[in-house]
Amino acid sequence: MAKDKDVRPIIKLKSTAGTGFTYVTRKNRRNNPDRLVMKKYDPVVRKHVDFREER
């Protein structure tokens, strides 16, 4: 019912290195309305790379 317009939805963060590796996290839509970008570890390339929010 109200799951679609949740304030803190579950999002996928996909690696920009092109490996297809993803993290799953939650974000607050009120504080961060734009797409989230985080620097996290990608075990496929064994480096820290940018992970972008996938829609």
Swiss-Prot record:
SUPFAM superfamilies, A to Z: Zn-binding ribosomal proteins
The keyword Isomerase is assigned to this record: no
Keyword terms: Ribonucleoprotein, Ribosomal protein
Annotated GO biological process: translation
A cellular component term, taken from the record's GO annotations: cytosolic large ribosomal subunit
GO molecular function, one term: structural constituent of ribosome
Protein family according to the UniProt entry: Belongs to the bacterial ribosomal protein bL33 family.
Pfam families documented for this protein: Ribosomal_L33
InterPro entries the UniProt entry points to: Ribosomal_bL33 (IPR001705), Ribosomal_bL33_CS (IPR018264), Ribosomal_bL33_sf (IPR038584), Ribosomal_zn-bd (IPR011332)
HAMAP family: Ribosomal_bL33
Protein name per Swiss-Prot or TrEMBL: Large ribosomal subunit protein bL33
